[in-house]
A protein has these predicted regions:
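Short, polar loop motifs at secondary-structure junctions
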Residues: 10-13, 31-38, 116-119
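A short acidic (Asp/Glu
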Residues: 16-18, 39-41, 96-102, 154
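Catalytic core and acceptor-binding pocket of nucleotide-sugar-dependent glycosyltransferases
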Residues: 95-100, 110-125, 131-229
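Short, well-formed alpha-helical segments that are part of the catalytic scaffolds
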Residues: 11-23
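N-proximal low-complexity "stem/linker" segments adjacent to membrane-targeting elements
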Residues: 1-12
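GT-A fold catalytic core of metal-dependent nucleotide-sugar glycosyltransferases
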Residues: 75-112
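Active-site-proximal specificity loops/subdomain of glycosyltransferases
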Residues: 32-80
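Short loop->beta transition adjacent to catalytic acidic/histidine clusters or analogous donor-positioning motifs
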Residues: 2-3, 22-29, 48
């Protein structure tokens, strides 16, 4: 069973990510064809394969189409390389202690770190199959899964500027392509075979450092009054 890592997004933190993730095997970085040549060469010289893409004509609400395009390109390349399961990470995120975490994730069909507890953070509302009156979707900075499930999840684009959180749209697409009942409650996702791995992060002293915000997402998501896992 071969595991891989897909980094997706722009190259702002190219040195930090390339220096760290280059110690692992089967790493690709899917980014845009207008990124700095100096940055791209640095990444390549670290042994990470770079996949260059044209930006989608329609970026989508909160750049959802850009996230989808880069994520799909990365996991699809890993599929072509014969990878069975992969970790998808944003290009502003470093997951520490991966040598300990990756073996713990092996065999998971699709896994997120955590999901927003329904009805707690009520500063948004949106319509997607049913009315949602709070943040209620899984976190997507880091996602692990079977390579076929990851390809299915990211293989779509949104033509309209729908004011729906990208995380919710991506979860909806995955669940509908797998003929799952779409509801973003923790109980339903668990019942449908989706899992969460914050507990493994805690047990292995993993940090998920979101460089853009300067926070360790493990500390953020472990608050069970706000998140479930």
């Amino acid at each position: 069973m071969k595991q891989g890592i897909c980094i997706q997004g722009p190259t702002e933190y190219y040195k930090e990510l390339a220096d760290y993730y280059s110690q692992f095997e089967n790493v690709v970085w899917a980014t845009w064809n207008d990124e700095s040549i100096i940055r791209l060469d640095y990444i390549r010289n670290k042994g990470i394969e770079v996949i260059l893409l044209e930006k989608p004509t329609i970026a989508g609400y909160m750049n959802v189409n850009m996230q989808l395009a880069s994520s799909y390109a990365g996991v699809n390349r890993l599929f072509e390389l014969g990878i069975d399961e992969a970790l998808k990470v944003r290009s502003d995120t470093i997951v520490t202690n991966l040598d300990k975490l990756l073996p713990r994730l092996q065999g998971k069909k699709l896994a997120f770190m955590a999901t927003c507890k329904v009805g707690v953070r009520k500063d948004i509302a949106y319509d997607l199959v049913y009315y949602h009156d709070s943040h209620d979707y899984p976190a997507d900075n880091v996602v692990y899964g079977n390579i076929h499930d990851l390809r299915d999840m990211f293989n779509f684009q949104i033509e309209d500027m729908l004011p729906i959180p990208p995380e919710a749209l991506i979860a909806w697409n995955y669940m509908t392509t797998q003929d799952m009942t779409f509801h973003l409650s923790y109980k339903n996702m668990i019942n449908e075979g989706i899992s969460f791995f914050l507990q493994e992060c805690l047990e292995e002293n993993v940090e998920v450092n979101w460089l853009k915000r300067g926070v360790n997402l493990v500390d953020w998501y472990k608050d069970k009054t706000v998140y479930e896992w």
